[in-house]
Design a protein with these regions (language model features):
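Sec-dependent N-terminal signal peptides
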Residues: 2-15
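Beta-propeller blade signature
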Residues: 111-119, 164-181
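Short acidic, Gly/Pro-enriched loop/turn segments at secondary-structure junctions
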Residues: 181-188
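Acidic, Gly/Ser/Thr-rich repeat motifs that build Ca2+-stabilized beta-propeller blades
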Residues: 15-159
């Protein structure tokens, strides 16, 4: 994929200039920057240790927007891929104040949950055990079809020793698509 993108850029016929600018700072193990679905000046930063920070007009809030530190597995070794791994805001986030998160809990289980940020109530939608400390995935996003897409890693270790990515009887090595439009639970 990188090669294809590089070839496309080379064939543009004009030089490409990239500029690095500071957006916000002072995060611990930031993994993801999630834009607000309807307000262009608001973003959310996901920290692996369990915090989600709100950034408005390039200014970090004084307090975390969401604190899941008591729920997530704290990464304890270099390369540890557990903790808070993903965040998705639905298109109607401004009205519902509901977010979706992907994290590995202290029991080494992947949790996909819906959180009402107005009252901080969490509903676990999907839960399954992780066999290793890495290859857990984490990316989540809403598609133009309104479904929530969830990237699930092969469960680890190096080389996928359990063959999870080829096994259709589990979630590993998959992109899940779920309908979260109901008030509780989800549909496939």
């Amino acid at each position: 994929m990188k090669l294809i993108v590089s070839l496309i850029i080379l064939n543009l016929g004009y030089p490409l200039t990239l500029e690095s600018t500071l957006f916000a700072e002072n995060f611990k193990k930031p993994l993801f920057l999630c834009p607000h679905p309807s307000e262009k000046n608001i973003f959310f930063v996901v920290e692996q240790g369990g915090l989600i920070w709100k950034i408005k007009n390039k200014v970090k809030s004084n307090k975390p927007f969401i604190n899941l530190k008591s729920k997530v597995h704290k990464p304890i070794i270099p390369g540890d891929e557990r903790g808070l791994l993903g965040l998705a805001l639905p298109p109607n986030f401004s009205e519902t104040k509901i977010i979706y998160v992907n994290y590995v809990n202290k029991k080494d289980e992947t949790i996909i949950s819906r959180i009402n940020t107005s009252v901080f109530s969490e509903e676990i939608l999907i839960q399954f055990k992780q066999p290793y400390f890495n290859h857990n995935g984490g990316m989540m996003a809403f598609g133009p079809d309104g479904y929530l897409y969830i990237g699930v890693g092969d469960g680890g270790s190096a080389g996928d020793p359990l063959g999870n990515a080829q096994n259709l009887t589990n979630f590993f090595g998959s992109i899940l698509r779920i309908d979260v439009s109901a008030n509780s639970g989800y549909k496939i």
